[in-house]
Design a protein with these regions (language model features):
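NAD(P)-binding Rossmann-fold cofactor-contacting core
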Residues: 163-180
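Rossmann-like adenosine-cofactor binding region
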Residues: 175-269
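C-terminal helix-to-coil terminal segments
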Residues: 92-93, 97-105, 119, 262-315
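Phosphate-coordination loops involved in phosphoryl transfer and adenosine-cofactor binding
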Residues: 7, 141-145, 216, 225
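Phosphate-binding beta-alpha-beta segment of Rossmann-like dinucleotide-binding domains, i.e.
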Residues: 89, 95-144, 309-314
Length: 315
């Protein structure tokens, strides 16, 4: 047990509409009959008036009297954790919410790249009826993948790809068993890990060890018919090296949900590349995202109020 932190008012910070509108999340929480807590959408300047704040991003105002901050993402690289500790502010994140959702998106991207579905969509807009060359589409169940990062996102992704019949290896700093994996490599062995994979899927969190992890040497180690899928963070890839690998046909293509700069600038080369699928950091989007966040927030309001340990405590 930890000390009780009565959470009676929670501000849902105004962050826009994605991945779930704040007003929708407030309505979901208001429908809970098991909580003695008021939920209100709040601005940054109003945050200090609340016992807890639910947010997408950190703001320094959260450190001025707030007992608890909940991050609706799993990633927290932009949160100053030492400041939270120094201020005795509990910080929790949303690990466990997005794993299945991202895995579904990765599955869709794998099938899109394998079958060339993005090409057909492009042709539809031009009213063109044209099949791909006979050898271009390939059978996913006879191919292989390497999932880099086997935490929440990677574990769910590896399991889903295994269901498709793929041979799946992984890369992680920890020894990981189960998940239908073949071999699990240490990050120092990433070039060996990706060398036989038709798909290299990036699901690792961003930190100092993973920033720039996937560079030109990794692309050189990949098969020429391999595809990169990135649903983690753009900074994990050395973007200039990826552009060069795509332009020089060192790899077959990519599906990219995350980038160095977001929104992706209009002059970014990826927009014009026929062998690249661009999605707007949307891999975790689903109509149930808000319900999952509401359940987690409600659980932590109850736990903090009664002296329990909150789920997904980071600080």
């Amino acid at each position: 047990m930890t000390r009780e932190r009565p959470i009676r008012r929670v501000g849902i910070h105004e962050w826009g509409t994605h991945p779930v509108p704040p007003e929708h999340l407030r309505a979901l929480l208001d429908d809970r009959d098991d909580l003695d807590c008021a939920f209100e959408v709040c601005s940054t300047d109003e945050a200090a008036e609340y016992d807890g704040v639910v947010t997408l991003f950190h703001h320094d105002e959260f450190l001025d009297g707030v007992e608890w901050v909940h991050n609706i993402r799993s990633g927290y690289e932009d949160f100053p954790l030492d400041d939270y500790r120094d201020g005795d502010v509990v910080m929790t994140n949303s690990t466990g919410v997005a794993g299945d959702l991202v895995a579904e998106s990765v599955t869709g991207l794998v099938l899109t790249l394998a079958k060339g579905l993005h090409r057909f969509r492009d042709q539809q807009h031009e009213r063109e009826w044209d099949r791909l060359s006979w050898e271009r589409p390939f059978e996913v169940g006879q191919s292989s993948a390497c999932v880099v990062g086997l935490g929440e996102l990677g574990g769910s992704t590896a399991s889903r790809l295994g269901v498709l019949g793929m041979d799946v290896d992984g890369v992680d700093i920890r020894p990981v068993s189960g998940l239908g994996l073949g071999r699990v490599y240490d990050p120092a062995q990433i070039e060996n890990a990706v060398s036989d994979a038709r798909f290299v899927v990036l699901t690792t969190p961003l930190n100092e060890a993973t920033r720039g992890l996937v560079d030109g040497s990794v692309f050189e180690a990949m098969r020429e018919d391999a595809y990169l899928i990135n649903v983690s963070r753009g900074e994990i890839v050395v973007e200039g090296d990826l552009v060069e690998a795509l332009e020089n046909d060192e790899i077959a293509g990519a599906a990219l949900d995350v980038f160095y700069d977001e929104p992706l600038p209009e002059d970014a080369p990826f927009w014009e590349m026929e062998n690249v699928v661009v999605t707007p950091h949307a891999a975790a989007q689903a109509d149930t995202y808000g319900d999952r966040i509401a359940d987690l927030v409600a659980t932590n309001v109850d736990r903090l109020t009664h002296g329990g340990t909150p789920w997904n405590r980071v600080v």
